[in-house]
Amino acid sequence: MSIKLKANLNNPPISGLATAHLINGTVPVEIVWSKEETSLQFPDNRLLVCHSNNDVLRALARAAPDYKLYGETAIERTQIDHWLSFSLTCEDDISWALSFLDKSIAPVTYLVANKLTIADFALFNEMHSRYEFLAAKGIPQHVQRWYDLITAQPLIQKVLQSLPEDAKVKRSPQSSKEQTPAKTGERKQEGKFVDLPGAEMGKVVVRFPPEASGYLHIGHAKAALLNQYYALAFQGTLIMRFDDTNPAKETVEFENVILGDLEQLQIKPDVFTHTSNYFDLMLDYCVRLIKESKAYVDDTPPEQMKLEREQRVESANRSNSVEKNLSLWEEMVKGSEKGQKYCVRAKIDMSSPNGCMRDPTIYRCKNEPHPRTGTKYKVYPTYDFACPIVDAIENVTHTLRTTEYHDRDDQFYWFIDALKLRKPYIWSYSRLNMTNTVLSKRKLTWFVDSGLVDGWDDPRFPTVRGIIRRGMTVEGLKEFIIAQGSSKSVVFMNWDKIWAFNKKVIDPIAPRYTALEKEKRVIVNVAGAKVERIQVSVHPKDESLGKKTVLLGPRIYIDYVDAEALKEGENATFINWGNILIRKVNKDASGNITSVDAALNLENKDFKKTLKLTWLAVEDDPSAYPPTFCVYFDNIISKAVLGKDEDFKQFIGHKTRDEVPMLGDPELKKCKKGDIIQLQRRGFFKVDVAYAPPSGYTNVPSPIVLFSIPDGHTKDVPTSGLKVNAPDAKATKKASSPVSSSGQASELDSQISQQGDLVRDLKSKKAAKDQIDVAVKKLLALKADYKSATGKDWKPGQTSASSAPVPAASSSSANDAVSVNASIVKQGDLVRDLKGKKASKPEIDAAVKTLLELKAQYKTLTGQDWKPGTVPTTAAPSASAAPSVGVNDSVAQILSQITAQGDKVRELKSAKADKATVDAAVKTLLSLKADYKAATGSDWKPGTTAPAPAAAPVKVKQEKNPDPASVLTVNTLLNKIAQQGDKIRQLKSAKSEKSLVEAEVKLLLALKTDYKSLTGQEWKPGTVAPAPTTVNVIDLTGGDSGSDVGSVLSKIQAQGDKIRKLKSEKAAKNVIDPEVKTLLALKGEYKTLSGKDWTPDAKSEPAVVKKEASPVSMASPAKDELTQEINAQGEKVRAAKGNKAAKEVIDAEVAKLLALKAKYKEVTGTDFPVAGRGGGGGGGSAKKAPKEAQPKPAKPVKKEPAADASGAVKKQTRLGLEATKEDNLPDWYSQVITKGEMIEYYDVSGCYILRQWSFAIWKAIKTWFDAEITRMGVKECYFPIFVSKAVLEKEKTHIADFAPEVAWVTKSGDSDLAEPIAVRPTSETVMYPAYAKWVQSYRDLPIRLNQWNNVVRWEFKQPTPFLRTREFLWQEGHTAFADKEEAAKEVLDILDLYALVYTHLLAIPVVKGRKTEKEKFAGGDYTTTVEAFISASGRAIQGATSHHLGQNFSKMFEIVYEDPETQQKKYVYQNSWGITTRTIGVMIMVHADNQGLVLPPHVACIQAIVVPCGITVNTKDDERAQLLDACKALEKRLVGGGVRCEGDYRDNYSPGWKFNHWELKGVPLRLEVGPKDLKAQQLVAVRRDTVEKITIPLADVEKKIPALLETIHESMLNKAQEDMTSHTKKVTNWTDFCGFLEQKNILLAPFCGEISCEDKIKADSARGEEAEPGAPAMGAKSLCIPFDQPAPIAASDKCINPSCTNKPKFYTLFGRSY
């Protein structure tokens, strides 16, 4: 079988044909010529329509991979793709890219990989098709060399010689110009369209249902064109339906407007309808829903209804009778006053997580006339109700909607099902979002009403009429929208892309004219020129478009900027004339060009390197030039993408329209309104107003108004005229002089401040919206004027140019550098902040661009690249450089305003003021804080005080410093790193949200990167900056600040004592919190005064003269002596710990060590260096010899990325794990669960999404366990998730353990609940009041209920998916018995089932036992447990628990029954038992390895995966089909045999990739089947747990695969059992206990069982402060008292706690635990 290439005679794919000849030896290709579009038909009858030559190249290269035409590596393929894309951009004209191509080809023979690839073929194809045209322009040397090389290829020669005559004619040079329009007409750029599910040719019906309340915008156009596309593609029907369900919005005028817009889009619907056609039918349907109790009439006010829907509270009218609903419905139909208060709501599900399903409104009463039905109806359906009905009635097969309607799909189908209508298929596509604009009808209307635009067809508007008026062609618009396809990816499209599509349409057809800037032109005197008129083509590539007249003469005009580019003695090419030699450029005294003298040089035809100019001859009659204006537009919104809560009105103050008067070509008089033209070297324009001769009334001609049409380029076209917001050269020069505009800037600054105050005042007073808008608009205009005057944005608190003295010339550059350096630092912080907050990409890109511009400016000023920590050299400051009193007064004033406003906000909140009032006050407060930051450069913090005014100047004695910046910067960076590290640790200890911590970690990493850039070394803990080598003696003449520091210290001490006292007295949280805030404010004040953070050993120090000494000067006897004492004391501490001394002894020694270190810091000013433990100090002192390093287990060698032959680093796949279980357990675990597709992280800390792969494991556990307890007689039920406070606190002992973890619901919307409601941490207190009702007699017992649900425990420990989460799934069983023995038996029966869950399902060994008194369930008699062990961390984990509650709860909740014999009331005996999704985490930790998950066969979602192997390019199609059929048959047989089996038949992944994928997901068995296996009637089974390969005959798979799965399970269980056994140690003395604990073991030790003794064991076995970083620090806790005791307690045995004198009762299992 061969590939059939059908080549188009009109546009033959030359290089595609060459490729076909090349691969024909191994992949036969049959070539057929036709006049149809080029296409490829593959042996399997797949048809690929090739819209370009590149499609042919790609397809053939992939069909013959052995030839490596598409490259060998990913880098090569990427480079080839680049050149393929590049060739497409050259379809119309490649000449602009020849210089780039010449540079690229100069050093190489071929484009990619130094060999012939389809990249060469693609580019050759484009050059060959227009070679004559390029040759006339001049082809660079290297491009010509490469072109000749490709042309000389035998394959190319063969193709060119074998072309049919028709094709040769089409390729002839003479016809190349004629070919361009044809080629444009053939261009087809369709996007990715997905076939509609269930669509049949000729039966598809789609609809476009706009609301007739406005003009269509580009988003509507996409919807209309997509519907039209599918209607045409399937030869179906397109319905144009006006959704006129809201009489208040629809008008007949807008219906006509929309029909006109559709006509412009060339959309011709097959059917026109209105939703109102079906009003009578919908009335009947509404009555039907009411009668069937599927709808009800409701008079809940709108705001309350919204609140109830948010809180999922049912309406009071929901339970009304059908009769009452019908009666109220009649009132609505009449439109009575009573009826107008009601609406009809569908009765769906108020508890649904989907808000659209919470009883939506389907009918409302509106006593308004309808444009079509008049006053016939008083009730109207909602769109959500009408849409599914009309779609069903009109036989719509596919309802196309944007993805924003996805939540309403369930609602749509509910109406269909409830009314038993035909069900259309809903197909979603992404909404079209454009940057720098708004598509909201409400916001667009605001622009029109505010007079900011001319109307709905304003060229700046995204309406269909607006963009068409600006110059968009219907064809360009259609191509752009269709290119988007039916993708569901929501992205913001840049306007450049749509205009780039448009350019491809208009470029071949737009006639060329000339226009010069009227005010900026120069006369050229051309010697030898005569006045004559010539005819030239209006389009250089298409003579069929007509001719234009060009006047030649001795005097001509050119643009001033072009005159500046002329060089005397060189030729310049005057377009449409020829080369002219420039003789003299005449200038006046000030250097401005006045005229140019030149001479004709038409004989010279060398146009390669000449300057190309547009020009106009000087006409005798000035009226020959039509008055012309070029109008340039900018986007209506200055920000690319608006944030969710951002007000678009904040980004509209910029200039969006600019008119430039031009000297127009006389030929422009012929242009008509709507014509699209090109002003040469200026761009494309659309004639908005055509020229009209002088009017008889005014005697003034009507000027030509040309609207600039963007062409998609980001760079300006040379001399393209004044662009919006681009100041001219003179303006720039003026702006550069700070003195000239300082007065204006100062005045503007004052006006902006006043206007800002006015805006804030209006907002705080809740003024009318339009009044605020006017004030804001004026404020934005003032800011724009300020920017024009100063060249920079206005910022709060900045001083204008007039307030600063003009710097001396010698220091101005340095001052500028200082300013730019500060701006760079600030912008860098902003970029890091944006990245930390996960801001949108456009926003980050804009900030990065600004940062790069600042760095470039810095380099220009200083001559060197900017580096982190750089401090530019500045001129010596004068004595008057102290901070001004005025500035300090301003800061003090802002601080007082912040304090007052803060008090106001707190008063409003405490008084329960309405939200709007509070919000206004908060906004004012935030504005004041922003003013504070602008004035001081730092954020406002509680307790901040204004800097004191400078009483006297500071005298600074300055001495030479060889490297001032380096020392200062290193110190600064080290301080920042330390502070940031402290901040992160605080966040982690406070259990802050993951996203918040991640943002701070990123900032810390950035600081460490800056440190490395500055010092060349990695930052390490304990790093100390080198001491400065200069001495700066500073004399402070101010008063002693020591007294202030001392005062604050005493206040801190007193406040700390007060808080500790409150906590010891168990004071309420609301009492303690204000005191803590006061303490924090005092610590902030201490830091302000002393310059360092408060520590417990902080002391008041008198103000002394600080000296920063060199390292030599620091070598003092006091320092040496302290260093020796600290080292000696450190040895004492380590010795005490090594000898297992009592905790009191160790604590005392550690306290001495800390005191010595504090003294060291006091003497030296630096912390004692931990790393190295250096001795005596002093530059030349030798350090103590380091201790002999202890041997550590060898770590796996980290593999570096392999390099290819060229030395480049090859890309590595990120499919597998990048952390190992042995080296980095947390990262490894996180990667296993995410890459194994077990969980997805969620934005609520501690809560996670369980994906299908993990939930299947939970489902397997649930299914097995539920069947087992059902056999025991346990029934299933469900109780509410909410618990009242009174009930929860009934059992004080029970709630004690849960109290800190209980999550409370305190609000309903903005209102406080009357009483807080708890979210269940467990369900005893929820279920037992019901048990008390249900149990009356012994006949009601036993009650044995179980529920599968979720619980919430708001733990403050570090959340870990599965192992420790704030919400988790579990099963909880609650039973009640009359007989205690029966209850006790059930406890152990359930425990046995839990043990089987682990051993039988999860292949994990467990220890069964009873919890100690300290660890048992609160409120129970005793707790039994199964404990598992995770050797990777050396920690145990509680697997499941079964509690005997005794009569504790039955006495509390009065669950009693009457004894049949004594007739007395007796309390029941109760049990509770549960197992959670924690089991999944245990399974992962125990079994998973460094390749990913290892799933036990009994719970694996897929037990065996079938992977076809051995398919190559040489595999025949019938062999491939046979292999796939055999694999599918194998899969079917295994499924029939009870094996959960699937096949991986994806053809876009290699077998190796699939192997890695399924290994990562832990599938127990991989079954490999290849052609050879098929012949041998066998398969290869690969075990995931051991990677062992086993060959199995296909005939025996039904027996051997299940048996092999059982073998795998046993093997995994045995391996885990051996691991657990080897890590379980029996110990009888404390030294062994601590030693084995540190070696990651669990310990069986004799124990007395006392709670106080257990606390002591846990405390004493905890790691000390100086233990290995990163290792678990907690002490050992009791895990359980095993049922299987290792040995009886002997008389000589002692409790494992060395200080305990009690007799041990049993061996207890101890260990570190999760």
Curated annotation (Swiss-Prot):
Record key words, sorted: Aminoacyl-tRNA synthetase, ATP-binding, Ligase, Magnesium, Metal-binding, Multifunctional enzyme, Nucleotide-binding, Phosphoprotein, Protein biosynthesis, Repeat, RNA-binding, Zinc
Residue numbers spanned by region 6 X 57 AA approximate repeats: 755-1201
Motif 'KMSKS' region, residue range(s) on this chain: 438-442
Subunit-level organization: Component of the multisynthetase complex which is comprised of a bifunctional glutamyl-prolyl-tRNA synthetase, the monospecific isoleucyl, leucyl, glutaminyl, methionyl, lysyl, arginyl, and aspartyl-tRNA synthetases as well as three auxiliary proteins, p18, p48 and p43.
Ranges of biased composition (kind: Low complexity): 734-746, 800-817
EC number, UniProt record: 6.1.1.17, 6.1.1.15
Name under which the protein is recorded: Bifunctional glutamate/proline--tRNA ligase
Record keyword Repeat present: yes
Short name of any one Pfam family annotated for the protein: HGTP_anticodon
